[in-house]
A protein has these predicted regions:
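Iron-sulfur cluster-binding cysteine motifs and their immediate structural context
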Residues: 2-4, 9-12, 18-42, 47, ...
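Iron-sulfur-associated redox domains of electron-transfer enzymes in respiratory
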Residues: 64-363, 382-390
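Short, charged amphipathic alpha-helical "coupling" segments at sensory-output junctions
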Residues: 398, 402-419, 513-516, 520, ...
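Sensory modules in modular signal-transduction proteins
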Residues: 408-441
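PAS/PAS-like sensory domain cap-loop motif
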Residues: 440-450
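PAS-family sensory/regulatory modules and their coupling/dimerization elements
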Residues: 461-509
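Sensory coupling linkers of modular signal transduction proteins
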Residues: 493-538
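Signal-transducing coiled-coil/dimerization helices and immediately adjacent hinge/linker segments
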Residues: 520-578
Length: 578
């Protein structure tokens, strides 16, 4: 039976989520839902592969930690077994491998064995079934790959081997041998195993799943140093080549169906792209068995490994350990039931959207014309159309589109400039006019100013002082009787844009009501704040994508606000902040 309300194995630290959409981009099945800029994992869609955990640059994605559950088992059960996944040979230093059994016994485990003993039994059963069936069968050792087939490739469910994973095979063996009340803790590199242990039809077999990372933390917290542990034998070790299971092609080699890359009887697939493209292969090529591993290069690259070694060194460690003499009694054939049932369980009913609905969203984001659909991927989706479908499905937001948000920000900036009663001019570093609003054109009695040097209209000296860095903020009266100019000039550099901004506040004639001056200055403060907030908002949207910062701009504009307010004093409807 499918899991109707899956318990999430991956969640989000909202305080660390920075709107970078990296998790959306790397999730193989787009199981990330973005609401109000916060990215969260949809447990129904999630495969538990842990790609988002590994890829999140802010550490905002994290898998569920089950260490308290393991500690509780050791306190409440009379007998608890530890099953160590074969990837441990790549996760720990070679000198530490035979010290792990002693360390686990110090934690309180009564039985310590390699999960590879279950892998050997599953491989033997897989080989027998593969020889009986004509269509290529799909191995079921990887829970993320099984979840992908059940949720997103239901037509391939009949091809799944009707066998449990090595973890479940080992758990059934332990329960059959030591009693149903025996506790069973699996330790490996896989986050998806946490979800597999909670499948309703397998409930009660695996009591707790830990990662190698959690085990390392546990040993550290208990003050257990592997360097001070003696070498010790496992209670059971696998037969044959089962220690190869965590590397690409390992299960096929264990089953005796692949002697090398030239063998046409089996296909080893690792990484999502390989799974997506290769799972549906037909029997024309003579393939009997397909081994899918969601993590590229296999379980030695799982998200639960904390290792500074590169993937190839980890693989070499596993290969060497598989050839080393075995320490401990070899497990005999098991009488445990290895059968399993799998069935299609799409995460949600298929949602169909009309072309008109899609067109409307494209129009709303300024991408109605094909040439405006950049397909840049900044939002995390491969194409603009994919992003629109996600928006309609409630998985994404229009605001995730960077070009759309930039256009909106630019339009808002233009609106602020055009509605301001003050003259606003934007200059490049050569002090040529890039943009000027209508109020500035009226102030200098000219139009079509773009490209013209500012010196043709006002004294350039204040802008030269700002451009040279002589002053960070210029704020002083600017009078030119010959040109009929009487204003207060506030000039400052725009952050990260290599541009200067100038705001000209018209000064009243002598004798004019002082309240008008105060009102104008208040309006200037408001406009400056709006410009600041606009810059901050634009930077927030683009910072992770463009790598820019706005701290200096905020500081300068705040100085501007403080300078104007300190001279004007508190006004009616004061704009001051606590």
């Amino acid at each position: 039976m499918p899991v109707l309300e899956p318990r999430a194995v991956i969640d989000t630290n909202e305080a660390r989520c920075r709107d970078c959409y990296r998790c959306v981009r790397v999730c193989p099945v787009k199981a990330i839902r973005v609401v109000h800029g916060q990215a969260s994992v949809d447990a129904r869609r999630c495969l538990g592969c842990g790609t988002c955990v590994r890829e999140c640059p802010q550490g905002a994605k994290r898998y569920r930690r089950d260490l308290p559950k393991a500690e509780a088992l050791l306190k409440t059960r009379k007998f608890v077994a530890a099953s160590l996944a074969p990837a441990f040979a790549g996760a720990f230093e070679p000198w530490a491998l035979l010290r792990l059994p002693a360390a686990l016994r110090r934690l309180g485990f009564h039985y310590v064995a390699e999960t590879a003993v279950g892998a050997a039994w599953v491989a033997q059963a897989s080989a027998g079934l593969a020889r009986e069936r004509k269509a290529p069968l799909i191995c079921t050792a990887c829970p993320a790959a099984v979840g992908y087939v059940e949720k997103y490739r239901p037509e391939l469910v009949p091809r799944l081997l009707p066998l449990v994973s090595p973890m479940m095979a080992h758990a059934r063996h332990v329960k059959a041998r030591f009693g149903a009340e025996a506790g069973f803790v699996f330790i490996g590199s896989c986050v998806a195993k946490k979800a597999e242990a909670e499948r309703p039809e397998l409930a009660g077999l695996v009591d707790c799943v830990l990662t190698f990372e959690e085990l390392a933390d546990w040993l550290r917290d208990q003050g257990i140093d592997l360097g001070h542990c003696e070498e010790s034998a496992f209670d059971e070790v696998p037969s044959g080549s089962a220690r190869l299971f965590p590397v690409e092609g390992g299960s096929l080699a264990t089953a005796g169906l692949a002697s090398g890359p030239q063998d046409l009887g089996a296909a080893a697939l690792s990484g999502f792209e390989a799974l997506r493209d290769g799972l549906g292969m037909g029997q024309e090529g003579g393939v009997q068995l397909i081994e899918p591993l969601m993590c590229s290069h296999g379980c030695i690259n799982g998200p639960g490994i904390r290792s500074e070694e590169n993937i190839f060194d980890r693989r070499l460690r596993v290969l060497r350990f598989s050839q080393a003499p075995k320490s401990g009694p070899e497990a005999a054939a098991t009488r445990a039931d290895l059968s399993a049932r799998y069935q299609a369980c799409p995460p949600s009913p298929a949602m169909a959207f009309s072309e008109e609905q899609i067109r409307q969203v494209l129009e709303q984001t300024g991408k109605g014309r094909p040439e405006n659909q950049l397909n840049c991927g900044a939002c995390g989706y491969a194409s603009c159309r994919d992003q629109v479908l996600a928006v309609l499905s409630g998985m994404a937001e229009r605001e995730m589109c960077i070009p759309y948000m930039r256009r909106m920000a630019e339009q808002r900036s233009s609106l602020i400039m055009e509605t301001s009663p003050n003259g606003i001019v934007i200059l490049d570093r050569d002090l040529s006019i890039l943009n000027a609003n209508t109020a500035f054109e009226k102030l200098v009695h000219a139009s079509s100013l773009s490209g013209q040097p500012i010196s043709q209209y006002v004294d350039p000296d204040p802008f030269e002082q700002v451009a040279s860095g002589q002053v960070a903020l210029y704020d002083a009266p600017c009078r030119d009787e010959a040109r009929g100019l009487s204003a207060r000039l506030i000039a400052y550099p725009l952050p990260n844009e290599d541009r200067l901004a100038g705001i000209f506040v018209a000064l009243p004639e002598p004798g004019e009501d002082a309240r008008q001056l105060r009102r104008l200055k208040d309006e200037t403060v408001l406009q400056a704040r709006e410009l600041q907030e606009q810059q901050v908002e634009m930077a927030r949207q683009f910072a992770n994508y463009l790598g820019q910062h706005t701290a200096r701009g905020e500081q300068l504009v705040k100085k501007l606000i403080k300078a104007v307010e300190s001279e004007a004093g508190p006004a009616e409807g004061s704009l001051g902040r606590p």
